[in-house]
């Protein structure tokens, strides 16, 4: 199962351009990018918290 091909991405971009128009498209891209960045930071924070919890539990077991 592959990802999106170049042709698919171009088709999606053209449909988005037709639906939202050229003036609204940059705003939508910026909003989508910032949302994705926040999501990645949040999931990274959760993973870091999980790693900290595991290392604390291992240290308690050794003591």
Curated annotation (Swiss-Prot):
Would the keyword Cell membrane be found if you checked this record's keyword annotation? yes
GO CC field: TAT protein transport complex
Q: Which Gene Ontology biological process is one annotated for this entry?
A: protein transport by the Tat complex
Annotated membrane topology: Single-pass membrane protein
What are the recorded GO MF terms, alphabetically? protein transmembrane transporter activity
Where does this protein chiefly localize? membrane
Keyword field? Cell membrane, Membrane, Protein transport, Translocation, Transmembrane, Transmembrane helix, Transport
Q: Name one Pfam family in it.
A: TatA_B_E
Q: Where in the cell is it found?
A: Cell membrane
Q: Which InterPro entries match?
A: TatA/B/E, TatA/E
Query: Where would you find the membrane-spanning parts of this chain?
Result: 1-21
**Subunit and interaction comment:** Forms a complex with TatC.
Membership in a protein family? Belongs to the TatA/E family.
Q: What does this protein do?
A: Part of the twin-arginine translocation (Tat) system that transports large folded proteins containing a characteristic twin-arginine motif in their signal peptide across membranes. TatA could form the protein-conducting channel of the Tat system.
- This one is known as Sec-independent protein translocase protein TatA
Source organism of this protein record: Shouchella clausii (strain KSM-K16) (Alkalihalobacillus clausii)
Species classification: Bacteria, Bacillati, Bacillota, Bacilli, Bacillales
